[in-house]
Amino acid sequence: MIPDTATQLYQRVEALADLDSDAVEVRNRSLHAALAQVCHEGVKDTGMAFGNLFSQVDYLCRSRAVGAADRQEIQTMRRHSNSTEPIADADWPYDLRALALLVSAVTSTDVPSTLVGRLPVMGRPADLSHTIDRRYLRCVVTDHDDQFIHVHADGDGTGDTYTVDYTAHSYLQPLLKRGMQLNLIDCHEGKHLEPGLIIVEPDYLLDISQIARCFTDYGHHPLAYVANRLSPAANSYAILLGNFAGRALDDIINHPTDYDWLDTLRTNFRERALDYCTCPDFAGGATFKVDAKAQVDNLCGIVDNLFAPDPASRRRPYRRDRAILEPSFVCERLGIQGRIDLMTTDMRLLVEQKSGRNYNIERGYANQYGSFQKEDHYVQLLLYAGLLRQNFGLGRRKTDIRLLYSKYPLPGGLVAVNEYQTLFREAIALRNRIVAQDYAIAHDGFGSIIDQLTPETINERQLSTRFFSDYILPQLQRLLTPLHTMSAVEHAYFCTMATFVMREQLAAKVGSNEGVSASMADLWNMPLATKREMGNIYTGLTITGKEKSKGRGGWDIVSLDVPDQGEDFLPNFRPGDSIYLYAYTDTPNPTGAILFKGSIVAMSQHSITVHLNDGQQNEHILADSTYAVEHSGSDNTFTANLRSLSELIHAPSDRRQLLLSQREPTADTSRRLTRPYSPTYDDTLLKVKQANDFFLLVGPPGTGKTSMALRFMVEEALYDPDASLLLTSYTNRAVDEICAMLTEAGIDYLRIGNEYTCDPRFRDQLLDRRVGETPRLDLVRQTLLSARVVVATTTTLQSRTPLFTLRRFSLAIIDEASQILEPSLMGLLTHIDKFVMVGDYKQLPAVVQQPAALSQTTDPLLTAIHLTDCRNSLFERLYRREMALGRT
């Protein structure tokens, strides 16, 4: 910075020091103006967008390596300049000293001698009353009143009872229950514990992105979280563009000299061909290319800026070779988990990318936080930063956090933000309210909240803008109104099944019987010795090979050597299992590691091969180290089941009545088979053809029902030139058997799914293989529309619901149907004209974690339709009804 500028800024400090002692009323205003000028000079050439002085001061102090004590002094000065209260005489000289220190840091010059003698040599005396005595304490609530929580410490080695003053967290009062677990974070210990943060049921991890999604212009009510989970799976032009931009960021960072954006476009389209073809507002390939290229151009400039040295800064540049994309983290301390868009492995940089519109940037209007980021994006970034701080013991100033808006070029496209603690605490409070709500639903039933699940409740701020009234409100009404117009049996069914799903989710997250049922919380609660004894962890792994499954993509196939795991080790893993892969030094600790999420491809006694969900293009990331593999968890299945139940309630009345046994299935006995197939099966095949709504085929395993009866049903159905068939089952093994039958019969089919859970013999039938290396939208759509037989697991179909917006199937055949729980099928069956279930009601039902007493129901409305236990399949319920009516 030129000397003249430094001189001018110091002269402003001198002018402030020359103010008359009685000019108290102008101190704040004058100090604020001088501070604004200093900050402007410091950030004007950074190429980044800043909002209020808080974020500017924060950035300048960190980039100029200002010490922690001086940084605190400068921020105190900033707060004083913003205050409506006149700056006190005792504070004034210290504030001027802080301003001079900031000028010195920004201009890289020494404070002139003309000022040295007029300013304090040291900062203001520290307030010693605010030291933190306990960083973390896990405890259990024994009692509480309006001011204090009485807790029993768990795991601090003392077993002591503490009294916690929670007056700063009064919103917790209606949430607290005896026996509830809490994490107390950053406690000040005096007469009582005063925690900085209180985390309710911390083993129940919530996804950060889902918490952030609840922050809207109309409020952030915890019931918005429930509404979001009931909403149809989103597939839009903006989402597709965002997925492309995320892939482009990865490619740009890792191919600085030979990047070709068309490679990214082709790869992204091939991987998401189904989403592109079923997107309802896709504007066409030409328009998408223009928008995608604009995102790429902006990203190239932003990435260059992000990793370039800053001549005006003492900050070391961020290292491109330490950049990592899409790493996962679990944080038991805060009860959250998430996947970060971009960070460096030294934790110095954290970036969240957004590709959509930001009206604050477009209009140049700062938000209520004095900056340009959207609130939900801000919440997401703050929670990620808090997660890193808790997991890795980072200081608050260790990590620089940025929001990358790839729709906009610099400076608007890269927003430096500060760690605004008020909003962070608000986000944690919402997390606590959501968790308490989920526990209440699991305990009291979904019916306990359904009356409050309305647009009026979710619109906390009673917003009535035109945008809300014309766009948001109709969406909420379409989603929620059917919940309040259900018939009595529909209401009983929906609430009972939704409660069942929520209880399964609770068991999957925290366990229903410690030491017996598996749960996500085993990652940090289960001792290492127990993990080994139960076969729930591989340790001491070393990488023996890395492969790229997709050309210029990342290394996503990782082979690891498995050393001796102990004499009695029996792995509780199998191919297809979802896992975390992470490095460690001494003891495996998933909460203190960067996690790579993936699935097991192959395993033997001495080796294991995993496929990473997000391949790493940076060769330095998966380096020589010692690795562990553990089971990972996800809310996807439970969210899909809730969404499936919602689809049922939104289905046409005739369909709801059929699936809930409120109308009889019909048949057309005039239909005849087109040809004889086998004396053993012809009578059954004729009944299948004559059925209009559904047919149940009962047969024990090994009777040839899949290889013969299913084949004949498919062949007969395909005689109708307008027929379209969907063949499905719960397991990939069963779907592989279906594919084998179709292949042997010479029947063409299309398989939807993941190649690493598909038998290699049938991978050529996968959609991304069929569309080739240079896919075209029209050809992909034609492939989907012309495929008369589509094969997939029920889990895959639940995650690919946009398929049903493109086409409707005339017949679905569901194999091993007695192993599939009702919530997993109901949504699927609303998109099918007719279905055939093949199964055996005598087989054991699907594995359920909650106690049998909780899954049973005695509601007469449900027992009347033969629903007595939610752990039984739809196949069994319908079979029992047909038996009772004598129709078998």
Where does each model-flagged region fall?
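Amphipathic alpha-helical interface elements
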Residues: 1-112
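Conserved ASCE P-loop ATPase motor domains encompassing nucleic-acid-directed helicases/translocases
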Residues: 137, 144-172, 182-184, 508-658
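Mg2+/Mn2+-dependent nuclease catalytic core
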Residues: 153-177, 318-432
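A non-catalytic, helix-rich entry segment at domain boundaries
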Residues: 248-325
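Walker A/P-loop NTP-binding motif
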Residues: 706-720, 737, 741
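Conserved helicase motor core of SF1/SF2 NTP-dependent helicases
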Residues: 719-723, 729-731, 744-746, 781, ...
